[in-house]
Amino acid sequence: NSIIIPQRLQFAGYTSSQALEVFGKISGMAMPLLFLPFTVTSALVVNIIPNISEQMAINNLRDVENKSSLAIKLTMLVAIPTSALFIIFSDHIATLVYNQKDVGNYLAIISYATIFLCLNHTLSGILHGMGKQIITTINFILGMGLQLYCTYFLIPNPKYGVNGFFIGYLIASILIFALNAITLRRHIKLKLKLMDNLIKPLFSTAIMILGMYVFYVGLSIVVKSNVINTIIATVVGTILYCLGLMITKTIDFKHTINSLKV
């Protein structure tokens, strides 16, 4: 990507300096923010892989199914609000972190892939614990091949431009997720509830976003600082999201912690 994207952008009409500037903002500014949720999914993966490997060795598929379902649920609880936050408050976040509002445009677009990226990370970890490294590698290569194809052929098209990369990135993330999910379902039965894994987190996220918006607008009347307003609104939003999860009984924190320890 570091070679192809700038070159293909020049075919779309960008100058060399413009192409490098756009690529730098995407890869050096927007992408690092996109990977922030991985700090949580990485902790899950590190915790789960050894446990799943042990349970697979003694053919305890029930525990593998329970651990995998819990890991996917926790991933969704992190990925959904993060994705919404990056999409809706992208300009404020980009201004807060980089003092460059235009980076927010790239962050907002690429953040549609957040949920799939996080799920891919978790699903790959589960499959690795089951000894399916070769399959996950093949799935990843197929996804990256599709991404490179879109990058190479869509970016030079003036109709798409740099959005060609985002399209390829999103489609590739969805493809890898689908392949990993299909692979996992062939080996274990996941116990996933639509209400707990999607509906309730979406409801809590809606409360979070609404609360953040109200607080940000209200604070902006008194405090003329994007930094302070964004930080306070984010803290308030996080609290509201956690309260939403507790009110809807989406997750039992004590049970979850104990399950991860076992």
Regions of interest found by a model, annotated:
Residues L123-G131, A181-N197:
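Alpha-helical transmembrane segments
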Residues Y213-V262:
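Membrane-proximal transmembrane or re-entrant/amphipathic helices at the cytosolic face
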Residues I135-G161, L175-T183, S204-Y216, V236-L245:
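Alpha-helical transmembrane segments of multi-pass membrane transporters
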Residues K67-I87, I93-L96, N163-I188, L202:
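Short alpha-helical transmembrane segments in multi-pass integral membrane proteins
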Residues L20, G24, F86-I115:
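Interfacial segments at transmembrane-helix termini and the short loops linking adjacent helices
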Residues Y112-L142, F153:
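Membrane-interface junctions at transmembrane-helix termini in multi-pass inner-membrane proteins
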Residues F35-I58:
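Helix-loop junctions and terminal segments of transmembrane helices
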Residues N1-L33, E54, A94-Y98, K249:
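Helix-terminus/linker motif at the lipid-water interface of multi-pass membrane proteins
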